[in-house]
Amino acid sequence: MSKRESAKYKIDRRMGENIWGRPKSPVNRREYGPGQHGQRRKGKMSDFGTQLRAKQKLKGYYGELREKQFRATFDEANRRKGDTSENLISLLESRLDAIVYRAKFVPTVFASRQFINHGHVTVNGVRVNIGSYRCKAGDVIEVRQKSKQLVTVLEAVQLAERDVPDYIEVDHNKMVATYARVPSLSDVPYPVVMEPHLVVEFYSR
């Protein structure tokens, strides 16, 4: 198992949930966290603990984002008009690495970030190698010609465990996706319940 795979499953074990809906997730076989003390019975969680857990789960889902980066995203969501929790999800889903993952060009969000960093993706015809790059509605994301036959890409397209959401239009024959619209929380196909309102409460303490 690669370090990336190990880290990903460690997040699942820590959360006690299969947050990406992966068939090989260890929490499909056991219901306790990582480490020698993972089997201890958990008591009732405090409000702070519940809020912290919601933040960790959302950060983990998008590839274990660094706290500074996640907080900056929250701060921008908070500055925008409208519901902060909805704004937060919209900003996270507008990340290039999230869109490449949603389009099923890669098997995981971790692989998406690496794929982009290695220069395999263009946005509106221009190569972009920053996973956190923010896309706008109407942007066209394409796998570069020389990268379309990579085994990682070919296998990801065939994954039956997740579907492409309707806010992303994809042509897998051409390996092109259009970010059709910015989604709301109810549009996003999370395999587990995400609670961005608790993230808002956490940062509002």
From Swiss-Prot:
Q: Which UniProt keywords apply?
A: Ribonucleoprotein, Ribosomal protein, RNA-binding, rRNA-binding
Report the Pfam families cross-referenced here.
Ribosomal_S4, S4
Checking InterPro entries in the record gives: Ribosomal_uS4, Ribosomal_uS4_bac-type, Ribosomal_uS4_CS, Ribosomal_uS4_N, S4_RNA-bd, S4_RNA-bd_sf
Q: Which CDD domains does the record match to this protein?
A: S4 (cd00165)
- Protein's UniProt keywords contain RNA-binding: yes
- Domain named S4 RNA-binding: residues: 94-157
Subunit comment: Part of the 30S ribosomal subunit. Contacts protein S5. The interaction surface between S4 and S5 is involved in control of translational fidelity.
Instruction: Outline what the protein does.
Output: One of the primary rRNA binding proteins, it binds directly to 16S rRNA where it nucleates assembly of the body of the 30S subunit. With S5 and S12 plays an important role in translational accuracy.
The protein's name is Small ribosomal subunit protein uS4
Question: Which gene is the coding source of this polypeptide chain?
Answer: rpsD
